[in-house]
Amino acid sequence: SRRYEKLPVSIFKEQEDASKMIVDDIIITANKKINEGKKCVLALAASSACIPVYEDLVKAYENGRLSFKDIEIFSIDEYYPLERNELQTHYRFLKEYIFDLTDIPQENIHCLESSKMDDVAAYCNRYEEQIKLSGGIDILITSGMGSNEPGSPYNSRTRLITMNHTTRVSAASDFF
């Protein structure tokens, strides 16, 4: 049987107002987790739509409202196969907008490997296990649904997918 979630939705006239609310929610969640002796786990997309949120997160860090020392970050998707430091990787994007601008320890950064590998399915299972060992995802920031293409099961996890034509056209600007 299908389950339908009832998620609270906020609609904002200005993108800046939405970004500030999201960052405030992250700060509240992070402080709560840290006060419980746990790390806050964020799952982040590499999308231009997320840049205002990431810029506000960096401002919060610079203003002393947020430290990334007890925050773990998981990337939610990646192009495959690309070498990690190629311009188009989501790792590079997150490095430019978050990792290099905050005090996040390297060991708290979990990005999907994008270079060619022998057993992608086993790697994806290990990535899911890392998320589980970290306590699960507290907050997900995305502009889509982690490249869930039409036909993807609603309960799907980390996996290799083939992007459909519409997604490829949308992503093409990353490569030119």
Model-derived features with residue positions:
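Ligand-binding beta-strand-loop-alpha-helix segment within the catalytic cores
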Residues: S1-K6, L66-I139
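N-terminal glycine-/serine-/threonine-rich phosphate-binding loop
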Residues: S1-V41
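Short glycine-rich or small-residue beta-strand-to-loop segments that form or flank ligand, phosphate
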Residues: V41-A45, F74-D77
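Glycine-rich beta-strand-to-loop/alpha-helix junction loops that act as flexible
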Residues: L44-A49, S143-M145
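Active-site catalytic pocket residues across diverse enzymes, especially alpha/beta-hydrolases
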Residues: L57-G64
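Hydrophobic, aromatic-enriched interface-forming segments
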Residues: I137-S147
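Class I SAM-dependent methyltransferase SAM-binding "motif I" and its flanking Rossmann-like core
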Residues: G146-F176
